[in-house]
């Protein structure tokens, strides 16, 4: 569609791809926040458990890095590697600069995970606004709300389970599984994935 000059069709295609990406990336990121303490307790030595919150910031940053891949599509399609390199360089410089300042100032390497997120977020913003005149993908506010709400309810469900159950490997798997079920159910009830779910169900029934 891009090669044919149909930018609107390309924008719709990328917008749907972004929606599908967020359907997976948001719960994955929120899930890391929900079970990072369980994961650290069950899998790591005691000395490393305290740093479990680092996992969330790394996952949060990676989520925005994934979004950036969709934002830079116009530059990729036109082989404008200079624009990509320039923005990624700025994002990296922000990360390094903040590390040099804040780690020395605060004396905590925990801040490195936060600055990594900030660097990825800056890169995303630069890419998003840098390509908006060429190709602007959009995500419906209703879809974003449903995804965030479903992820929030998933987090709450896992949080409640953690109150009553010990942190170990078996329960880690249980928390993740229950979180996936809750997220999927809320998404379906909200109507966000009802069409996709019904399509899959119909294919299974026909077989």
Residue ranges and their predicted role:
Residues 156-207:
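Membrane-proximal transmembrane or re-entrant/amphipathic helices at the cytosolic face
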Residues 71-79, 128-142:
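Alpha-helical transmembrane segments
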Residues 35-40, 44-48, 79, 102-107, ...:
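Short helix-capping/hinge motifs at transmembrane helix termini and TM-loop junctions
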Residues 16, 50-54, 108-112, 139, ...:
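Residue-level signature of transmembrane alpha-helical entry/exit and packing/kink sites
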Residues 70-71, 97, 113:
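Transmembrane alpha-helix boundary/hinge residues in polytopic small-molecule transporters
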Residues 1-88:
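Specific pore-lining/lateral-gate transmembrane helices of multi-pass inner-membrane transport
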Residues 83-109, 119-130, 146-162, 178-187:
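Alpha-helical transmembrane segments of multi-pass membrane transporters
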Residues 21, 55-58, 62, 88-92, ...:
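Residue-level recognition of transmembrane alpha-helices
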């Amino acid at each position: 569609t891009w090669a044919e000059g149909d930018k609107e069709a390309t924008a719709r295609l990328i917008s749907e791809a972004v929606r599908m990406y967020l359907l997976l990336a948001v719960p994955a990121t929120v899930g890391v926040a929900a079970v990072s303490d369980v994961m650290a307790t069950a899998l790591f030595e005691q000395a490393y458990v305290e740093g479990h919150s680092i996992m969330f910031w790394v996952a949060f940053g990676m989520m925005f890095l994934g979004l950036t891949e969709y934002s830079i599509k116009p530059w990729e399609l036109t082989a404008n590697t200079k624009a990509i390199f320039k923005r990624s360089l700025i994002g990296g410089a922000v990360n390094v600069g903040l590390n040099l300042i804040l780690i020395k100032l605060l004396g905590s390497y925990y801040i490195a995970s936060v600055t990594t997120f900030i660097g990825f977020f800056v890169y995303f913003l630069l890419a998003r606004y840098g390509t908006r005149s060429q190709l602007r993908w959009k995500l419906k506010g209703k879809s974003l709300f449903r995804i965030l709400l479903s992820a929030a309810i998933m987090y709450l469900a896992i949080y409640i389970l953690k109150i009553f159950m010990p942190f170990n490997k078996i329960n880690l798997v249980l928390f993740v599984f229950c979180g996936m079920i809750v997220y999927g159910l809320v998404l379906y009830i909200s109507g966000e994935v009802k069409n996709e779910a019904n399509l899959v169900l119909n294919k299974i029934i026909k077989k």
